[in-house]
Each structure stands twice: as structure tokens, then as C-alpha cells.
Amino acid sequence: MNADLVVVGAGFFGLTIAERCANELGLRVLVLDRRHHIGGNAYSEPDPETGIEVHVYGAHLFHTSNEKVWDYVTRFTKFTPYQHRVFSILDGKVFPMPVNLATICEFFGRAMSPDEARAMVAEQAGEIDGADAANLEEKGISLIGRPLYEAFVRGYTLKQWQTDPKELDPAIISRLPVRYNFDNRYFNDKYEGLPVDGYTAWVSKMADHPNIDVRLETDFFDQRDDILGNVPVVYTGPIDAYFGNSAGELSWRTIDFEREVKNVGDFQGTSVMNYADEDVPYTRIIEPRHFHPERDHYPNDKTVIMREFSRFAESGDEPYYPINTAEDRAKLLEYRDLAKKEPDVLFGGRLGTYKYLDMHMAIGSALTMFENKLKPHFAGGEALVSGGVDE
């Protein structure tokens, strides 16, 4: 095999590893991905009817306060000044999210100062001691009070998890942000924006190196016997699948997308609209044209929308969010022990660590793996730490 390193998975984690090893160390890197495209879940493509760029696997919004990550990603793309804002429909009314002073004033039907709103929410939240919360519902009430919880958390959570919040682990919502001002930016990071030319153009530049060989629609497991033991591997696929689900499958939630072209220039006036009512089957609607208002070539008489439906992932589904039950955590410990014994294989990324990672987190984690493990091995002759999960 004419490769110094094999990377399994062409998402942000895998491509960051491949790019660093090829550009900085001059290594020959073979990247394998079972899909027909690179970029993992950040992959985007133009809708065939409207030409509007669609985030195929759901909305991807780049944001970070990590200077190292920002310096790295801006080598490959310029970013628009897009700032993400989310709204939620409840009982036919629209509220800004996350909960802020505008949300509170609109919901309770009166103007309040920051101190008045803070005191009211604290009084309502005092119904339950957060330290004693036995489930997600009790935790939610202890954080924002019953009225706001019932309005904006309960129904949405029920749809997102298909489980009564009274039966969910309180750790799922360790905090619920409430802003006592009128700031409705969704993220608070120093840097935020969307790649000017789209995500696929961005990741294509990362992979554009003569030493990087990307092979799509290629299953690592069909070639693992030829790879393992012959060349180091960075594996970003599901950690349970790597070990043949020997400790059992880890549980995930998946998302079904329903794409539709509407014969209007603007369907909802914003990129993401949540639906908090329990009787609405989808959790939110994405209208991708609003991600790039600077693009004047989008049609003014058509738009594309994507409805999101959340459910438990079954065999063959795309895993999105780790459910992370106590049973899952026990299985993960077994897989981590197995990973430590796997020679010359490093596990990383969302699937490889069973952690939900935003894009900047995946990139940052990959940069750390490169600096702390791969670079010392290939450039300094240090032994590659056998196995282990990059955390």
C-alpha cells in the first residue's frame, strides 16, 4: 500500500488530519469514505430546481472563539458575516430563541426590565430545587420555571427524543440559556459566518493536495485486513462498528429530511424556524436561501425548504446525536478499553468518540491529535500511542 497513513472518514476531523499530515509532514495519505462525497455531514449541494445551496444533512453554522481553529479554517475559505438567529412558533405566535428579554415580554404579555424578568423567572424556577431534579422536566423547570419550560422545552423535547421528558436524564439539559437583554444571536462566539463558496468548496480545498488520495464509496471494512498492521490508521467511523458491536450497539438519534420546493420567493423569512407545539410532527423548518442573502442569483419566485423529523436511529440510519444513556456509557467504556489495545489505530471525530461535536470542535480535536500524537510519531520518531480515543 502506497500510503503512510490511512484516514477513515472524509468529514472535518478526517480531512484536517489528512491535510496537516500531507502539507506539514509530506506524508502520503489515503482517505476512505463510504459516501459518494467528502465533507461528512457538512456536505452541501445546489438544489437541482432552484440552484439554492442546501445543507444536505441539516443546518451547519460555523462559529468558534478558538483562535487556532479560526486561523486554520481561514486558510481554505472566506466567511460571510452571517449571524445565526432562530425563531420558534408556539400557538400561532413567533418568539425569538434562545429565550431572551423579547421572548419573555412577548410570552407574558407585558414589558419588563431585565431585573423584573430575572426576578420573575427565579421565582418560577424556585418551584423545584435543581440539585434534587430526578429527570429532564424537573431540571428544566428548575432552570427557567414551569411556564417557559412548558411553552418552549417540553413539546420540542418530546418530539426530539420521542420520550416523555419525565423519563429523560436531567443531564441532557445541564443548562438552558436565558438572556435578560434583547440579544437574539444564537451563538456567542467571537467568530461566526458561513463559507462564501459553500461547505463543499471549502472541504475540497482541504483535500486538494497531490499527497492526498480520496477514495469515495469505499468501505474501510472491506479492506481492513490489508490495512491494519501495515499502516497507521485514524478512524472516524462508529467506534462500536469497528469492534463488530461486540459490546452492543451504541444508541443514536437520527433525522429524516423532507425537502420541498415552494413557488414563493420567501417561505418563512428566516433560515431556521422551530415548532414547539406537540401536534406539529416536525421539529423545525430550514429555508437555506437565508443562509446567503448576499447571493443575488437565487430565484425570486421559488425557494426550497427542509422539514426535520427526529427519531431513534435504526440499523442503516445515519447517526446524528448520541443518546448517551447509562447503558450506552457502560458500552462506551468497554469500547475505549478495546481501543487502547488496538495497535497503531487512533479514534476520533463524532462517531469515533461517541460525542456530539460542532464543526469547530471536530477541527480543534483533529489539530490536537496531529500535534500531540501524529507529528511526534512521523516527524520525531516517537512511538505512536497504541489505540485510544481522542477526547
Put a short name on every predicted segment.
Residues 1-13, 30:
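Beta1/beta-strand and adjacent pyrophosphate-binding region of the FAD-binding site
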Residues 46, 286-391:
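Conserved flavin/dinucleotide-binding core of flavoenzymes
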Residues 19-48:
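Glycine-rich FAD pyrophosphate-binding loop
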Residues 24, 218-338:
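Mid-domain catalytic core of redox enzymes
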Residues 12-13, 36-38, 102, 158, ...:
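Short, solvent-exposed loop/turn segments at secondary-structure junctions
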Residues 84, 91-232, 243:
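Active-site/ligand-binding neighborhood in enzyme catalytic cores
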Residues 16:
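Short alpha-helical segment within the catalytic ATP-binding CA
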Residues 59-91:
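N-terminal FAD cofactor-binding segment of flavoenzymes
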